[in-house]
């Protein structure tokens, strides 16, 4: 277990030296922020298509910080791109906007209200 964590730390250091990253805005605890950066660095290193990068970041962050399964608790969302505008609502201390190489990455958690067809 300790070897695995050390190996992940070494991989993170290598990726940080290979990729440029900058946190633009963050309303996350530092440990969550560091995990988001590490996951984003791995995604950019591993994938070329933006949809794959976004899916990987969301999927890995969901695995790292799983919810209880309640629909009203909230879920993570991720946007990756070079040029876009956004306006999102997020849970308190659950938002980060960073730049990795030439890509902007936004990761946030918001409550997911159960959908009722017809607005009932």
UniProtKB/Swiss-Prot annotation:
Key words of the record: Cell projection, Cilium, Cytoplasm, Cytoskeleton, Dynein, Flagellum, Microtubule, Motor protein
Domain of life: Eukaryota
PROSITE patterns for the chain: DYNEIN_LIGHT_1 (PS01239)
GO process terms (BP): microtubule-based process
Cited Pfam families: Dynein_light (PF01221)
Gene Ontology CC: cytoplasm; dynein complex; microtubule; motile cilium
Signal sequence segment: none
Compartments reported by the entry: Cytoplasm, Cytoskeleton, Flagellum axoneme
Self-association and partners: Consists of at least 3 heavy chains (alpha, beta and gamma), 2 intermediate chains and 8 light chains.
Similarity comment text for this entry: Belongs to the dynein light chain family.
Name of the protein in question: Dynein 11 kDa light chain, flagellar outer arm
Organism per entry: Chlamydomonas reinhardtii
Lineage per the UniProt record: Eukaryota, Viridiplantae, Chlorophyta, core chlorophytes, Chlorophyceae
